[in-house]
């Protein structure tokens, strides 16, 4: 209730009650259903750009989080990994659900100790890697839901240079820094530029009367194979360096 009231005050405070609807709004990233409904009343055209669907609350350009996670986990499995961990958000998160579904598809166990819920920060990725170091049972492959946290994990590995445990790490987003980590980060690239272009197209098309129903446009991610993943047999050897 408190969150809902705070949301009401925040959105109402942004706009005059008697003000006519504004033209358009593009929302990048996660936005809860209540906020979407309120913003949809304030604008003539609202478009969401995200990895998690709005369930047809507004027009959306989507790179499906489940498919992103599936591509990442499938790649780890193709390298022989069976003990696969997850780092990232879990609640209402399509990438986490994609991780779970892909393990189930291959009859692989979901081990609770291999799942560490984190926010999207380098520091929390670093801390997650430290937790694995302290465990007696560690995954050989790890899917990290975002590049930023994965970079934190790689920095932790580089600092300790543990030559007896070097998991394969794969993530998603393909931010610029992913090409300059040591080792270079394997990730699933999102077509960010195209997502932005199509979001603008949908926004303008609705304003011009080109469509009235809710439109969902889905784009595919692309696996970017670099150096942070290797076969399961190599999980105990270190090529990590500062």
Predicted regions and their residues:
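N-terminal glycine-rich "phosphate-gripper" loop used for MgATP/nucleotide binding
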Residues: 29-30, 146
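Bacterial carbohydrate/catabolite-sensing allosteric modules
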Residues: 1-2, 8-24, 35-242
């Amino acid at each position: 209730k408190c969150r809902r009231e705070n949301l009401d005050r925040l959105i109402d405070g942004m706009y005059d009650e008697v003000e006519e609807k504004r033209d358009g709004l593009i929302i990048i990233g996660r936005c809860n259903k209540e906020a979407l409904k309120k913003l949809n009343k304030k604008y003539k055209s609202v478009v969401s750009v995200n990895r998690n669907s709005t369930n047809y609350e507004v027009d959306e350009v989507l790179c499906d989080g489940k498919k992103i996670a599936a591509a990442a986990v499938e790649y780890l499995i193709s390298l022989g990994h069976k003990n696969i961990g997850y780092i990232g958000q879990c609640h209402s998160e399509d990438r986490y659900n994609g991780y779970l579904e892909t393990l189930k598809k291959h009859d692989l166990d979901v081990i609770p100790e291999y799942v560490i819920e984190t926010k999207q920060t380098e520091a929390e990725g670093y801390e997650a890697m430290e937790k694995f170091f302290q465990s007696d049972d560690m995954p050989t492959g790890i899917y990290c839901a975002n590049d930023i946290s994965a970079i934190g994990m790689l920095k932790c590995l580089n600092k300790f240079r543990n030559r007896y445990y070097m998991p394969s790490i794969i993530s998603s987003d393909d931010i610029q820094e992913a090409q300059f980590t040591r080792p270079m980060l394997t990730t699933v690239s999102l077509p960010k530029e195209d997502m932005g272009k199509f979001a603008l197209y949908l926004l303008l098309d609705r304003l011009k009367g080109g469509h009235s129903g809710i439109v969902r446009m889905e784009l595919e991610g692309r696996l970017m194979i670099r150096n942070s993943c290797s076969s399961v047999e190599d999980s105990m050897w270190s090529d990590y360096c500062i």
